[in-house]
Each structure stands twice: as C-alpha cells, then as structure tokens.
C-alpha cells in the first residue's frame, strides 16, 4: 500500500487557490450565514444570463445585495427563510452560474494540461456519441460478458460538499456550495431532473452538470484505480483521475470494507481485457471474464457506493448480460454480438470438403417499442402506434408544420443511421408522415383522401428520401454508393448529444 500512497499523493504545486475569494471577501460568508439577506429584493433587468455570469458581475450583485440589507427590510415578507422569492429566480441563478464558471476553471486547465502531456489530437470527432459504436465493434466482438450499470446518485447534499473538498482546499467555496445545496436546492430535483421544475435542473444546467460530473468523477477515479491494480495492462487514459487529496485514506477505507482482503482478492480479476464506457448515468463494463468474476465486480461496485458514497444501491441496478444472448440498451440503440456462419468450400488434393467459419459481428438495432412510447408521449401517435394529428400546431402555417415534421424525421434518420436493420426506422417515419397529413387535414377541416388528391401522392415522399438525398450530395458521382450507404450502416461523427425522442426526457425535438 505504500507504493500506492506515493503514486496517488497530490503534488502541492497543482493545488488551485481560487481567485474569487479575493473578489468577494466577506460577502460569501454573509450569504451563508446572514439571514438578513433573505429580505433583500433587487429589481434586475430581464434577459439571458449566459453573458452575465462573469466573476465581476457576480461580485457586483453580491455587493449590492449586502448593501441593500441595511437599507430596507420588508415587514410583509411571508417567508423570511427563503432566499429565492417568486421574483428572484434570475437573481439566484446568476450567482450559481458565476460560481459554476469559476470553479470549472482549474479543472479545465488540468484537462488541457493532460491532453498536451499525452499529445492527443484535439479532434472534434472524439466528442461524437457515434464514435462509441465503432469502439464497440472493434473491441467488444471478442468479449463474452457485459455489466450494465446504472450509477446511483447521492441522496444527501453534504456528500457532494465532501467530494468537492477532496479537490479544493478553499473554505469560502465550500461555504458557498453548502449554501446553494441546503438553502434553496431541491435535492429530489437533482435525482430526477426530468420530472422537476427546479430552477437548478431547468434554468441552471451548468451548475447541475458540474455537481453531477463531480460525483461521477469521484466514483470513476476509485473504480479505475481498482481496475488498474487488478489488471496486467495499465490503463493509459485515466491519468488525471489519480490527482487526489487523501486518496490513500480512501483506499484504506476500502480495505477495511472488504475485510482486509484487498490484495488477496485482486488476483481473481487479473485479466488484460476490460473496457469501460459511460454516457450520463449509465455505464457499460465489458470483459472476457466468466460470470463468477463479473459477480465479483458487481459486489465491489455495490460496496463502493454503499460504504464510500453512503448510497444504497440495489444489486438490480447492475445487470450481468451475455454479449451474444442479451441486448445492451445504450444511447438509444439495442446492441449485441452475433455469430455469422460462413461456409467456405476448400479442396486439398482431390478431396473437396466444406468448412464452416464462425464470424463474430457486433450489431446495433433501433428499439421500436421505446421509440413508439416517445412518439406517444409527444402526441404523434397513440399507445398502439396509430398516427394521430398534432393539434398544438394547428395554428401554424402549412410550411412550418411540414418543415417541423421533416426535421424530426431527418434527425431520427441521422441519429439511427448506424442501425443494422432499417425496417423499424421506416415504421417510425410512416407514423410521422401520417401524423403530418392528419395535422394538415385537421387544420384545413378536410379528409385525408381529398387532401392527398389535391397535393399529389409525391407530397410526402421526401420523408423517406431525405437521408438518401444528403448522401447523394456527399457522393455526387456515385449514386450507387450513396444508396448502398443509405441502406447500410453509417456512423456520423458530428453528433454530440443524444436525440430528444431517444432520450425520453423531452417532448419536442429542438430544430437545428
């Protein structure tokens, strides 16, 4: 364990002392302890906040608040303990946004230094979601078992404050973070943001993402440490994860949790092949190990969450799947391995014989049932998949309705272009096409037959030919190549976020 301590100690020169305590001085402590702040109401101009979240603007806002306390106290304040009033959402939002911008600075600098040290190419393709699936195809085809993991969230806000304390030795920032979490933060909204009206989940996405990423970053640092110490091959992409304060103490806690058998049990995991992929709160751990060893990893993860993060995680949140029998639901695709038998005729001297060669492939398909469920939620069809009209768009122009439906089809086709089977995608396009027709018919108070007869049968053919038309523009001199790519699998490296209908969190697709 001594060599681990030497390896994991944080260099004093890399500790970052934040600049904003010098700017805010005693105002941060006033925010955290002076309840007279709760009675201040400052009229703020309306507008966006992205261009107003600098440290200077936040300092001015806090200064005005601090001075306003001593000038006016409203006796009719019905809730003196509530910092955020009905008209102060922009006020608190601005402070939290400025806090998020400032605390992100040292971590972004650390990432840039790590990329420069590793001499990695800063390509935008690395940010594409679709780049994960070629990685699956190249590395998962020879593996056997997969751990499908849902990362649990901490229930108590103080856990995030403690996690943040491992990174930054700055009391004022901890006071401010604790104030945000305890005074006006609805913690249930962080756990289930899609069902919440909390301003942090809906109007402060930067602050929400910072807290969430800090939690996941802490979890993955310990996980990669265990993985690297249990493997013959060391990971080359987890270098910055080891820059931790008191990391040696964490390892000692893990040793106590695992009944002082840390070194005795790690030999069970020694295998050079293990891959880890995560997007948001879902991760995939693939290995060539047998089910017994995968159960060991499941045991270690559950105990890590329970004893270090104080999060009770049911074992059902971690599923052990066979790569060639079960599907992996990840990023809106159902993925699994498949064995294809290829018969080859060979001849040796005068005797001819057949050889059956089994070729391993990794296929990805479109999950039709979840997509229809998303279309049902968005009011494009009913629960049986029958298209219905979109009454909320009835007041819009015909060109707007058609353009809106075509953008949805284009986005779905673009996102699911890597599917091995396109028939499910054709059904989704059919639902949207008929829903578009019914929406126009509802607007004009006509019938489907009369409407299509008036516009022609080729009116909605673009719903099926849009993606092929795009590929024909990319390959203008090879029409056969563009059609083959349209029917085949294409991974686009310009997709940096998951599709809204696939993500099941939003009801509308935002036009590009």
Swiss-Prot record:
Lineage: superkingdom: Eukaryota
Recorded GO CC terms: chloroplast
Keywords associated with the record: Chloroplast, mRNA processing, Plastid, RNA-binding, tRNA processing
Name this protein carries in UniProt: Maturase K
Annotated function: Usually encoded in the trnK tRNA gene intron. Probably assists in splicing its own and other chloroplast group II introns.
Main localisation: plastid
MF annotations from Gene Ontology: RNA binding
Record lineage: Eukaryota, Viridiplantae, Streptophyta, Embryophyta, Tracheophyta
Family recorded in the similarity comment: Belongs to the intron maturase 2 family. MatK subfamily.
A single GO BP: RNA splicing
Subcellular location: Plastid, Chloroplast
């Amino acid at each position: 364990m001594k060599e681990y301590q030497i390896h994991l100690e944080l260099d004093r020169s890399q500790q970052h002392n934040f600049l904003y305590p010098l700017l805010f001085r005693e105002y941060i402590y006033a925010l955290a302890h002076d309840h007279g702040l709760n009675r201040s109401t400052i009229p703020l101009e309306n507008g966006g906040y992205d261009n107003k979240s600098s440290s200077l603007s936040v300092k001015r806002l806090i200064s005005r608040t601090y001075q306003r306390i001593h000038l006016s106290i409203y006796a009719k304040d019905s809730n003196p303990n509530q910092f955020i009033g009905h008209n102060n959402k922009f006020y608190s939002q601005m402070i939290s946004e400025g806090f998020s911008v400032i605390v992100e600075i040292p971590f972004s600098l650390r990432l840039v230094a790590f990329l420069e040290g590793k001499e990695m190419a800063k390509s935008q393709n690395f940010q594409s979601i679709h780049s994960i699936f070629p990685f699956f195809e190249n590395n998962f085809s020879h593996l056997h078992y997969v751990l499908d993991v849902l990362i649990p969230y901490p229930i108590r806000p103080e856990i995030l404050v403690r996690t943040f304390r491992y990174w930054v030795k700055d009391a004022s920032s901890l006071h401010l973070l604790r104030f945000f979490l305890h005074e006006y933060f609805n913690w249930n909204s962080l756990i289930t943001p899609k069902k919440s009206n909390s301003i942090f989940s809906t109007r402060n996405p930067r602050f929400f993402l910072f807290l969430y990423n800090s939690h996941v970053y802490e979890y993955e640092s310990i996980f990669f440490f265990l993985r690297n110490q249990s493997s013959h091959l060391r990971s080359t992409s987890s270098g910055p994860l080891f820059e931790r304060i008191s990391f040696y103490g964490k390892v000692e806690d893990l040793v106590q949790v695992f009944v002082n058998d840390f070194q005795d049990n790690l030999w069970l995991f020694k295998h050079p092949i293990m891959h880890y992929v995560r997007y948001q709160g879902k991760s995939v751990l693939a290995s060539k190990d047998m089910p017994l060893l995968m159960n060991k990893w499941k045991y270690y993860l559950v105990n890590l969450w329970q004893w270090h993060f104080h999060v009770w995680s049911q074992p059902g949140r971690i599923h052990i799947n066979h790569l060639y029998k079960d599907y992996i639901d990840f990023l809106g695709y159902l993925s699994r391995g498949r064995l294809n038998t290829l018969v080859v005729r060979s001849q040796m001297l005068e005797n001819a014989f057949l050889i059956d060669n089994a070729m391993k492939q990794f296929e990805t398909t479109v999950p039709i049932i979840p997509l229809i469920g998303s279309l049902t939620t968005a009011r494009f069809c009913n629960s049986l998949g029958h298209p219905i009209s979109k009454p909320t768009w009835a007041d819009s122009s015909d060109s707007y309705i058609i353009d809106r439906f075509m953008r949805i089809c284009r986005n779905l086709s673009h996102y699911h272009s890597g599917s091995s089977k396109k028939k499910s995608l054709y059904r989704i396009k059919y639902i949207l096409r008929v829903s578009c027709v019914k929406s126009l018919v509802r607007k004009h108070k006509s019938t489907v037959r009369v409407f299509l007869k008036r516009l022609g049968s080729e009116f909605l053919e673009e719903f099926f030919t849009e993606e092929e038309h795009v590929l024909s523009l990319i390959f203008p001199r090879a029409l056969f190549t563009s059609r083959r790519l349209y029917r085949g699998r294409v991974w686009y490296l310009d997709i940096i976020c998951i599709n809204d209908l696939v993500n099941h969190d939003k009801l509308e697709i935002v036009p590009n």
